[in-house]
From Swiss-Prot:
Lineage, highest ranks first: Viruses, Riboviria, Orthornavirae, Negarnaviricota, Polyploviricotina
Chain residue ranges for the region called Disordered: 205-237
Subcellular location: Host nucleus; Host cytoplasm
Predominant cellular place of this UniProt entry's protein: host cell
PABPN1-binding, as annotated region: 223-230
Superkingdom, taxonomy of origin: Viruses
PTM note: Upon interferon induction, ISGylated via host HERC5; this results in the impairment of NS1 interaction with RNA targets due to its inability to form homodimers and to interact with host EIF2AK2/PKR.
Family according to the record: Belongs to the influenza A viruses NS1 family.
Listed GO CC annotations: host cell cytoplasm; host cell nucleus
Motif position, Nuclear export signal: 137-146
RNA-binding and homodimerization, as annotated region: 1-73
The species this protein was found in: Influenza A virus (strain A/Chile/1/1983 H1N1)
Name of this chain's protein: Non-structural protein 1
Amino acid sequence: MDPNTVSSFQVDCFLWHVRKQVADQELGDAPFLDRLRRDQKSLKGRGSTLGLDIETATCVGKQIVERILKEESDEALKMTMASAPASRYLTDMTIEEMSRDWFMLMPKQKVAGPLCVRMDQAIMDKNIILKANFSVIFDRLETLILLRAFTEEGAIVGEISPLPSLPGHTNEDVKNAIGVLIGGLEWNDNTVRVSKTLQRFAWRSSNENGRPPLTPKQKRKMARAIRSEVRRNKMAD
């Protein structure tokens, strides 16, 4: 096992413990508490994958952090913080929308890289909007916290969430997972739109219907589907 993987996990465990103490003293805001819950699930998954005990890892992580802080001067710390880019946390959904339980009549689940896509295939002929809570850095989506698909009535019919056992994902991973979700929902004649916030930071552009632009792969797939439909119609005639 890569020692850097182990030490990274140990430090993450200790830093989560520190953040938990902040939350226990009621010093964290809603985004802070949201990330805390998500990171807890991620650490449990990583611990299971690595075969490491979280409590033991937290103690070792504390030693690593204390050693670094002891060796680092205040001036070096100030320079590091000044040069580090700051990320922003953006929210399409309220805490209630993020934490609400939902169920599927015809469940479908697919793993798209480090992300899990879930949707209800029983939903048909609905207008659906995708909302997400995520962090942004350099005006690009950095980390997806949670994405959910809502009908006009407010019902949740789909979701994309990071897999706890596979931490870390890219902007492209998120776009691919959204493509899977949109494709699954549109298969049943639903009309899907993406929130303006998600359009801006995931794609930086969209068409007039609020849809993200199709990738070359998606365009080729659509062209094949259209050609196939045309051939079937000619044979029927």
